[in-house]
Amino acid sequence: MKLIIATRKSQLALWQSEHVAQILKNTHQIEVLLEGFKTKGDVLLDSPLAKIGGKGLFTKELEESMLRKEAHLAVHSLKDVPSFFPQGLVLAAVSKREQSNDAMLSQNYKDFLSLPKGAKIGTTSLRRKMQLLLLRPDLEIISLRGNVNSRIEKLKNNDFDAIILAMAGIKRLNLDKQVNFVYEFSKDELIPAASQGALGIESINDEKILELLKCLNDENALIETSIEREFIATLEGGCQVPIGINAELLGDEICVRAVLGLPDGSEILKDKRMIKKNDFKGFGESLAKEFIAKGAKELLKKAESMI
């Protein structure tokens, strides 16, 4: 049997797809091919992600290729995957999670506190912008799009004093070797995006395919990301609004951190909870409902109007 993986063509997307392909080859001794596609999010590089808006910016074209029967599965950064799937497609697996925190890359400054007043920080994310301004209101946060290499290049050209990337991508592509300093944010400083660091394997809803993909599943990643995705789905929040949610398994307990608010950090809702591992089902939804009772929906509408 031959499996075809639909993938974006970015360096990180190809790494992720090749990583999954290798596991499938080793486990089942089957042929696995990669088919590259450009998504809307890859093409529209002039506008900040929040202004392009809409869900599925980095997934829609891959999903369409599966529905046309050109591919059997697609490998996504799970944080880019909307909560609901087109008919005929399913979330087949969530693979073992890489580090889920954010990091600051810089040529001249070894950590966040050493940044000078008014330092220029590059990031695409309103979630990061909001939390960075909570920590350092003096910073100038500038939208930064493009692939990882172009972002590193802009940093080296001194367009920015620092840029913010996910630790998962930094580790997968060995980006720490390309810059002088990498400062890892704690999850209390910067709460990550839902599912950050996890890979989501989406596939056609076919029993034979789903059976082959079972080997990719990681129970801990599934538990953590189900809380996070439930929280986002209940709030009906996409990647264009500033929401951070992270569930971290610590033995038989789970530490859940959540934040949402306005992009400038002037108004936020934030919480941190410890729950028993066995109580994870439904917790993301119940936490989101608590946030909604405190005015989360109104705050997110206000955030959208500021974009």
Curated annotation (Swiss-Prot):
Enzyme class name? transferase
Q: Which UniProt keywords apply?
A: Porphyrin biosynthesis, Transferase
Stored InterPro entries:
HemC (IPR000860), Porphobilin_deaminase_cofac_BS (IPR022419), Porphobilin_deaminase_N (IPR022417), Porphobilinogen_deaminase_C (IPR022418), Porphobilinogen_deaminase_C_sf (IPR036803)
Q: What are the GO BP annotations of this UniProt entry?
A: protoporphyrinogen IX biosynthetic process
- S-(dipyrrolylmethanemethyl)cysteine modifications at: 239
Q: How is the cofactor bound?
A: Binds 1 dipyrromethane group covalently.
Give the Enzyme Commission number: 2.5.1.61
- GO function terms (MF aspect): hydroxymethylbilane synthase activity
| GO CC annotation | cytoplasm
Q: Which cofactor does it need?
A: dipyrromethane
The record, for Pfam families, names: Porphobil_deam (PF01379), Porphobil_deamC (PF03900)
Reaction(s) catalysed (UniProt annotation): 4 porphobilinogen + H2O = hydroxymethylbilane + 4 NH4(+)
Q: In which pathway does it act?
A: Porphyrin-containing compound metabolism; protoporphyrin-IX biosynthesis; coproporphyrinogen-III from 5-aminolevulinate: step 2/4
Q: What does the record note on quaternary structure?
A: Monomer.
Q: Which NCBIfam families match?
A: hemC
Its biological purpose is as follows: Tetrapolymerization of the monopyrrole PBG into the hydroxymethylbilane pre-uroporphyrinogen in several discrete steps.
Q: What else is known?
A: The porphobilinogen subunits are added to the dipyrromethane group.
The UniProt similarity line reads: Belongs to the HMBS family.
**What's the protein here called?**
Porphobilinogen deaminase
Question: Its encoding gene is what?
Answer: hemC
